[in-house]
UniProtKB/Swiss-Prot annotation:
Broad class of enzyme this protein falls into: isomerase
Essential cofactor(s): NAD(+)
Residues involved in NAD(+) binding: 11-12, 31-36, 58-59, 80-84, 99, 124, 149, 153, 178
Name of the protein in its database record: UDP-glucose 4-epimerase
Gene that specifies this protein: galE
E.C. number(s) listed in UniProt: 5.1.3.2
Lineage: Bacteria, Pseudomonadati, Pseudomonadota, Gammaproteobacteria, Enterobacterales
Species this chain originates from: Erwinia amylovora (Fire blight bacteria)
Function as written in the Swiss-Prot or TrEMBL entry: Involved in the metabolism of galactose. Catalyzes the conversion of UDP-galactose (UDP-Gal) to UDP-glucose (UDP-Glc) through a mechanism involving the transient reduction of NAD.
SUPFAM superfamilies: NAD(P)-binding Rossmann-fold domains
Family: Belongs to the NAD(P)-dependent epimerase/dehydratase family.
GO BP term, example: galactose metabolic process
Positions annotated as active site in the UniProt record: 149 (proton acceptor)
Length: 337
C-alpha cells in the first residue's frame, strides 16, 4: 500500500515525503509544479536513497487522478496541494476557491470511487478568524476568516466534517498549521518559491543572499511590542513529523478531528529579522510598508492537544529555524534550480 501526497514537490510536501521515505513508506506524489520544482523530489531521493513515484498533474483533472488511483493501491492521502498566499487570495478569490475547494472535492470524489478512506488535510490557523482569542485552541470557534485563502480552508474543513458524518468508514484529520519555516538540516532542501516569495523567512533569506534588494515589512502600527506582526513559527521538519504522527493516529479516531501544529509562542517580524542576522552574520535591509489586506496583528498556537493525543511537540527553536534556512540559502543561492 502507498501514501499519496498531493503537492508533494512543494515546500512542506517534499519535507514530509522525505520523512515518509526515511521510515520506509511507499510514496506516490501528485503535483502540478505551479509553485514547486521536480528538483525538490530529486533531492529527497538523493538524501534518502529511495524513490517516490511522481505524477505531474492537477487535482482538477479527473482522468489524472483516476490513473493514479488505478495504478497504485493507495491506503491514505496527505493533501497539501493548493494555493497559499493570503494577499493574492484577496485579488484572485475565484482562483483560490477553484483550486483549494473544488480541487479537494474532486480528490475526495475520486478517493471515494477508489475506496480510499484515510485523509490528512493541510489546513491553516487562519480558520480561527480575526476575532479569535489567542492562543488558539481547537475548541475556539472557527469562522470570521479575513481572506479567501482562510475561507477556502474553512470550507474544506466543513466538507470533511460533513463527509465523515455521512460516511462512517472515512477518517480524516485537519492539521491547522501556523507558520512553517526552516529547511532540512543537510542544506539540500528548503523553501524555494517560484517568483517573489510570499512568506517572510524565504524573503529575508533572499535579501541576505542578494537575490532581492530589501524586505518589505507590512505594517509597524499593530498593537504588538514593536508594532510588527507576531506569528507562531514552526520548523518544517517538526511539521513534517506532525504529519506522520497524524497519519499513524487515523486508525484511532472516528470521523473528523482537528489539531493545531505550532510552537506555542510568537515572534514579531523584526525579531525574526534580528535572529536571521545573528545566524547569517550579515544585515537584512528592510523598509516599512502599509499593512496587507487580510493579515492579523498576532496569533500563536496552543498545541497541547497534539502533544496529548498525537505525542507530537516541536523540538526545534528559532535558532535552528534560522541556522537551517541560512544553511539552505547560502548553499543554494539560486534555490534548487
Amino acid at each position: 500500500m502507498s501514501i499519496l501526497v498531493t503537492g508533494g514537490a512543494g515546500y512542506i510536501g517534499s519535507h514530509t515525503v522525505l520523512s515518509l521515505l526515511q521510515r520506509g513508506d511507499d510514496v506516490v506524489i501528485l503535483d502540478n509544479l505551479s509553485n514547486a520544482s521536480r528538483e525538490s523530489i530529486n533531492r529527497v531521493e538523493k538524501l534518502t536513497g529511495k524513490t517516490a513515484t511522481f505524477f505531474e498533474g492537477d487535482l482538477l483533472d479527473r482522468s489524472c487522478l483516476r490513473s493514479v488511483f488505478s495504478a497504485h493501491r493507495i491506503s491514505a492521502v496527505i493533501h497539501f496541494a493548493g494555493l497559499k498566499a493570503v494577499g493574492a487570495s484577496t485579488r484572485k478569490p475565484l482562483e483560490y476557491y477553484q483550486n483549494n475547494v473544488t480541487g479537494t472535492l474532486v480528490l475526495l470524489e475520486e478517493m471515494r470511487s477508489a475506496g480510499v478512506n484515510q485523509f490528512i488535510f493541510s489546513s491553516s490557523a487562519t480558520v480561527y478568524g480575526a476575532d479569535a482569542p489567542v492562543p488558539y485552541v481547537e475548541t475556539t470557534p472557527i469562522g470570521g476568516t479575513t481572506s479567501p485563502y482562510g475561507t477556502s480552508k474553512l470550507m474544506v474543513e466543513q466538507i470533511l466534517r460533513d463527509y465523515a458524518k455521512a460516511n462512517p468508514e472515512f477518517k480524516t484529520i485537519a492539521l491547522r498549521y501556523f507558520n512553517p519555516v526552516g529547511a532540512h538540516e543537510s542544506g539540500q532542501m528548503g523553501e524555494d518559491p517560484n517568483g517573489i516569495p510570499n512568506n517572510l523567512l524565504p524573503y529575508i533569506a533572499q535579501v541576505a543572499i542578494g537575490r532581492l534588494e530589501k524586505l518589505g515589512i507590512f505594517g509597524d502600527d499593530y498593537p504588538t511590542e514593536d508594532g510588527t506582526g507576531v506569528r507562531d513559527y514552526i520548523h518544517v521538519m517538526d511539521l513534517a513529523e506532525g504529519h506522520l504522527k497524524a497519519l499513524d493516529h487515523l486508525s484511532a479516531i472516528e470521523g473528523y478531528k482537528a489539531y493545531n501544529l505550532g510552537a506555542g509562542k510568537g515572534y514579531s517580524v523584526l525579531e525574526m529579522v534580528k535572529a536571521f542576522e545573528k545566524a547569517s552574520g550579515g544585515t537584512v535591509a528592510y523598509q516599512i510598508s502599509p499593512r496587507r489586506d487580510g493579515d492579523l496583528a498576532a496569533f500563536w498556537a496552543d498545541a497541547t492537544l497534539a502533544d496529548k493525543e498525537l505525542n507530537w511537540r516541536v523540538s526545534r527553536g528559532i535558532d535552528e529555524m534560522m541556522r537551517d534556512t541560512w544553511n539552505w540559502q547560502s548553499q543554494n543561492p539560486q534555490g534548487d534550480s
